Amino acid sequence: MLIKQFSRRSKNMKVQILLAFAALFVLAVGSYASESKKLDLRDALLSAMFSADYQLNPQERGCRYFLGECKKTSECCEHLACHDKHKWCAWDWTIGK
């Protein structure tokens, strides 16, 4: 009798522990997905903000200024490089004349 009661309690506890781990797993996956969406949204907003090139036509000045839209680094002015992900001219971390 005592063994059956212990066995029943043990099974009940195992089920509770399994449910607790499943709940933690669901929370972890949900948290990761939420963080991923936040990062994607931030990148999309930054790209949208700076994708429109409101500056002068690049043919008029020969190069694109800071945050101007580009496809390759050669389109950007001196000390600027075309950002791989957002496709705008960003500082290339060089200093000089």
Curated annotation (Swiss-Prot):
Superkingdom: Eukaryota
Residue span(s) of the pro-peptide: 34-61
Database matches in SUPFAM superfamilies: omega toxin-like
Predominant localisation class: secreted
InterPro entries linked: Huwentoxin-1, Huwentoxin_CS1
Disulfide bond annotation, renumbered to this chain: C63-C77, C70-C82, C76-C89
GO MF, one example: ion channel inhibitor activity
Location relative to the cell: Secreted
GO cellular component: extracellular region
Keywords assigned by UniProt, alphabetized: Disulfide bond, Ion channel impairing toxin, Knottin, Secreted, Signal, Toxin
Annotated signal peptide: 1-33
Tissue: Expressed by the venom gland.
Keyword set includes Secreted: yes
PROSITE patterns: HWTX_1 (PS60021)
Keyword Nucleus listed: no
Domain notes: The presence of a 'disulfide through disulfide knot' structurally defines this protein as a knottin.
Biological role stated in the UniProt entry: Ion channel inhibitor.
Family: Belongs to the neurotoxin 10 (Hwtx-1) family. 12 (Hntx-12) subfamily.
Descriptive protein name: U6-theraphotoxin-Hhn1a 4
Organism from which the protein derives: Cyriopagopus hainanus (Chinese bird spider)
